């Protein structure tokens, strides 16, 4: 009898005894332990946020694409964002898994639920969502103080950018998620929000989907003042090459040489999104940032490095681009070439 | 090779293939992203494992997936076998004839409508499969006779038409649903759940049993409709049963795992090489063979590019498309 009791006690996890039910950002009810100690992150942005909150040592697993900060690369990986390995997640014995509705698949959430592993889901459509997610994570992960400090610091930087660009003329911006076929960011994305907050206006804000395709003609017709590319070698060829492409060379922005590569942190809804905001604002309104001591706003950054123009590559694949690629692949698989070949 | 369809032979065949299927299944349960030894897997299967993680991995993640692969494999292979008999065409296959695309369209429409309709997705997939089968069959008949190539072309064109509609519906879905749907369209067994299996297993087994009951009639149908009618086969009834049940099997398979191609072509062909074309031996061979081939394909899909995964449809297409071309050349010759 005693043995059975001891066995049962050994099996029950202490954290599970003190769980509380919270509603996550996606509206799911989640059993979150009071002091989660073993976290698995299913998206690079969440990994970045966890490190920014000083929770890196509680992270026991992340995705293949989690490359920032560099320590994140050393954590055990559970696979890619769209199709993480459930068995690896189980083997890491997490007491809380963190995912993001815009990057992970619903099936993953359902499967984790079935396995009895709590998943806290975030949503990120705007820059404010990203800031709110930091506060939410702070509450869920029992680190309110760090989260509040981080959130306030980021809000201060956002306010500073907004103060500087207030009243300036708003340049029209084309954000190139993918150049061939031209794919851009729709209105309900944090990219569009960053462009807006940085004192610009996205030329694709009237389109419905999140990552809409845009014909080159339509883009030319909308005549952007500035064209932005995220720094990601695989997806955006060198600017020199783009400038020479037929069609592309007709852009006024190309003729005036207003093409810029921005930090790929713009596609991560993490604290580094504010780095991207500052960078985009400085591109769109150089005068507003040149007059003050140019270092001032950079110093405000938490990061050691300035929000640089450094070209890092891997991170992009994790975002919705992978999705885009997937639907393109599905297009191809809809009718396998073998069928046509065979029919002839 | 030809195996006489005595009761003893059929029984022996079923026992041997079931044993192979069990071995392949055990191997599939042992292979995965997390390293588990055969001993650990065996302990979980016997219920004597004291490792909660191993238990969760084997019984909650790997087992549903292996079981789903076996059921889907059996469904598609049997659907292919009976369609080939009925249409007297070795190239008939739910995927090539567009039946899978019809099922996929039905399923994805249900997803688009959402709510209670989404729960009825397998039903809509069945309806889509049935409508496509009837449509392609009608197109393939000219002056009361089935034209082999007209039928195939009708199937291929229908498949591409339906794929276009699917792409259109995909653009209407929310970004989140598109991600799931795009994965599923390529053939995805990873969403296997215990609940689905409990619904799927009886339906698949019952359908295959009913089709087996018609296996003698299917043999006679190979001679041609008129000949079969002369020999006392109720042709209309056989046609109805085959169309309904092959559509049901395809609809269920597609709804559970997306459009996995060429299995209905590859497996019956292998089966005929192994036991001959008597449906009393061919049908059980195709059912168990389909299960074996898809479990193997899915294990390959999970391991060749580990830690990532290939869509299982890619693996079956790589193996199946060359067989299709080989059969096409032989038929055309």
Where are these regions (language model features)?
Chain A
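A short, structured surface patch at a secondary-structure boundary
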Residues: 20, 37-103, 108, 203, ...
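Extracytoplasmic substrate-binding proteins
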Residues: 22, 28-29, 96, 106-183, ...
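His/Asp/Glu-enriched short active-site or ligand-binding loop at hydrolase and phosphoryl-transfer sites
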Residues: 63, 188-211, 231, 260
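Bacterial N-terminal signal peptides
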Residues: 1-10
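Short, basic, low-complexity termini and linkers enriched in Ser/Thr/Gly/Pro
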Residues: 12-16, 293-328
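A ligand-binding cleft/hinge motif common to bilobed small-molecule-binding domains
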Residues: 103-114, 226-244
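Short helices/loops that flank or line small-molecule/ion binding pockets
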Residues: 86-93, 115, 214-223
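Short secondary-structure boundary segments
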Residues: 43, 101-102, 177, 207, ...
């Amino acid at each position: 009898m005693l043995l059975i009791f001891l066995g049962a006690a050994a099996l029950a996890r202490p954290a599970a005894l003190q769980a509380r039910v919270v509603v996550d950002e996606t509206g799911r009810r989640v059993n979150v332990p009071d002091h989660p100690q073993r976290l698995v992150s299913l998206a690079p942005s969440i990994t970045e946020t966890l490190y920014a909150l000083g929770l890196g040592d509680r992270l026991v697993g992340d995705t293949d694409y989690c490359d920032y900060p560099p320590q994140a690369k050393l954590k055990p990986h559970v696979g890619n964002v769209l199709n993480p390995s459930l068995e690896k997640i189980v083997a890491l014995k997490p007491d809380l898994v963190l995912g993001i509705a815009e990057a992970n698949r619903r099936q993953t959430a359902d499967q984790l639920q079935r396995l009895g592993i709590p998943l806290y889901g975030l949503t990120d459509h705007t820059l404010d969502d990203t800031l709110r997610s930091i506060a939410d994570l702070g509450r869920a992960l029992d680190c309110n103080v760090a989260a509040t400090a981080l959130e306030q610091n980021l809000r201060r930087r956002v306010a500073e950018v907004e103060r500087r660009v207030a009243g300036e003329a708003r340049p029209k911006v084309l954000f190139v998620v993918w150049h061939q076929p031209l794919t851009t960011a729709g209105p309900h994305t944090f990219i569009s929000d960053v462009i807006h907050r940085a004192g610009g206006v996205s030329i694709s804000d009237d389109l419905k989907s999140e990552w809409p395709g845009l014909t080159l003609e339509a883009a030319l017709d909308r005549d952007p003042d500035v064209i932005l590319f995220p720094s990601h070698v695989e997806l955006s060829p060198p600017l020199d090459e783009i400038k020479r492409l037929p069609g592309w060379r007709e852009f006024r922005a190309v003729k005036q040489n207003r093409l810029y590569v921005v930090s790929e942190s713009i596609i991560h809804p993490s604290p580094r999104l504010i780095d991207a905001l500052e960078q985009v604002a400085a591109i769109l309104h150089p005068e507003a940032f040149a007059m003050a001591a140019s270092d001032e706003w950079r110093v405000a950054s938490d990061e050691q490095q300035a929000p640089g123009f450094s070209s890092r590559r891997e991170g992009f694949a994790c975002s919705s681009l992978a999705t885009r690629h997937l639907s393109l692949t599905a297009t191809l698989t809809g009718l396998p070439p073998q069928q046509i070949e065979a029919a002839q | 090779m030809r195996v006489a369809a005595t009761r003893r032979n059929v029984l022996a065949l079923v026992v041997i293939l079931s044993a192979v299927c069990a071995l392949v299944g055990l191997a599939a349960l042992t292979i995965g992203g997390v390293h588990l030894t055969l001993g650990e897997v065996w302990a979980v299967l016997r219920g004597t494992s004291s490792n909660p993680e191993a238990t969760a991995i084997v019984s909650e993640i790997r087992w549903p997936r292996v079981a789903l692969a076996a059921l889907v494999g059996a469904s598609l292979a049997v659907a292919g076998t009976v369609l080939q008999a009925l249409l007297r065409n070795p190239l008939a296959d739910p995927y090539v004839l567009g039946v899978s695309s019809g099922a996929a369209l039905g399923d994805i429409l249900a997803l688009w409508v959402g709510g209670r309709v989404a729960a009825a997705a397998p039903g809509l997939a069945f309806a889509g499969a049935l409508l496509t089968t009837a449509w392609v069959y009608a197109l393939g008949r000219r002056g009361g006779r089935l034209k082999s190539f007209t039928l195939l072309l009708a199937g291929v064109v229908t498949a591409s038409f339906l794929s276009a509609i699917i792409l259109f519906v995909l653009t209407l879905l929310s970004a989140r649903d598109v991600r799931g749907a795009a994965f599923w369209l390529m053939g995805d067994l990873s969403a296997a759940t215990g609940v689905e299996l409990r619904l799927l297993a009886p339906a698949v087994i019952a359908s295959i049993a009913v089709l087996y009951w018609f296996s003698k009639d299917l043999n006679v149908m190979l001679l041609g409709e008129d000949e079969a009618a002369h020999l006392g086969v109720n042709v209309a009834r056989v046609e109805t049963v085959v169309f309904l049940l092959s559509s049901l099997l395809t609809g269920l398979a597609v709804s559970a795992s997306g459009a996995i191609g060429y299995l209905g072509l590859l497996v019956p062909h292998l089966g005929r090489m192994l036991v001959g074309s008597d449906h009393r031996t061919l049908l059980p061979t195709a059912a168990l063979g389909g299960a074996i081939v898809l479990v193997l394909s899915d294990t390959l899909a999970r391991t060749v590019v580990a830690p990532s995964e290939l869509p299982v449809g890619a693996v079956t297409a790589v193996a199946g498309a060359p067989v299709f071309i080989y059969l096409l050349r032989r038929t055309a010759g």
